Amino acid sequence: MTRAKPLSSLILPTLASAALILSACGGDGADAAAPSPSSGLVVATTVAPITSIVAAVAGDNVTIEGIVPEGTNSHTFEPEPQAAELLSKADLIFINGLKLEDPTLGLAEANKKPDGEIVELGTVVLPESDYIYDFSFPEEDGKPNPHLWTDPGYAVAYADLVRAQLSERDPANAAEYQSNFEAFKAEADKLADAVRADQASVPEGQLKLVTYHDAYAYFADNFGWTVVGAIQPSSFDEPTPSEIAGLIDQIQSEGVPTIFGSEVFPSPVLEAIA
C-alpha cells in the first residue's frame, strides 16, 4: 500500500479535532456540573462533545448536566426515566439534532418546563442543502450524518450558538461567555491551520481515509478528504467477516493510507484491517 508520508504527523492533528471538542479546554461531562454557578442557569446536554463545548463557553457560570454518558453509542442510546426530572428543571437543553438523539428529544419535549428551550445545534447551524448522506446514513432513511463537531469550523459554529443562547438568558455574564467563545475559536482555528499545513505535503490523490465509525464526513468535506468507508456498518454493530473482507479489498484497491479509530467504539477489527 502506498503511503504519502509517515502519517503520524497527519493523523495526530486530524484526530486532535475530536480531542479538542471532547476535552474542550479541559472540561468533560463528568466535571461540567462541579462548579458553583453564578447565574443560576441549569443546562442539560446530550452527547459528550456537546457537553464539552457548552462547558468551554459557560465556564463556571452554569450548572451543566450531560444525559448521554461519555463512551456511549449515542445512535442507540435510550434515556433513563430519571432523565425526565433533569430535563424538567433545565433552562436550556442543548442537543445535536439532525435526528441523532430522537428519544432524548422526545423526552425533552414532553418534560421541559414552560420557559425551557430546546436548542438543536446541528439543525440550526447546518442548512438542509448541506446535509451529507452516505453509506452509513442513506438519504432514504431520512437521517443525515450528524457528526458536525469533528470539523473545527462547525465546532466553532456550535460554540457561537451556545454563546448567544447563554448570553440571552444571562446577560450579566455575556462578556465572559464572549471571552470563553473567543478562546475556544482560537484553539479551533489553530487546529484547522495545523491540519491544512500538514496535509499540504500529502501527494495528490492520497487524502483518503477509513474510519471505524462514520464520524468524519463533514471534516472530510471541508478539508478535501475522501471517506472511502467505515468499519462499523450502518446498523452500528460489529462488522461481519464478509463485511471486513470487502472493506479490506476496498482499502487495497483505493490505496487508503489512513484508518481512524474511535475511543467510543474500540474494536479489535481495526488491527486486523490495518
Residue ranges of each PLM-predicted region?
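Extracytoplasmic metal-acquisition and chelation regions
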Residues: 3, 24-274
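Sec-dependent bacterial lipoprotein signal peptides
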Residues: 1-23
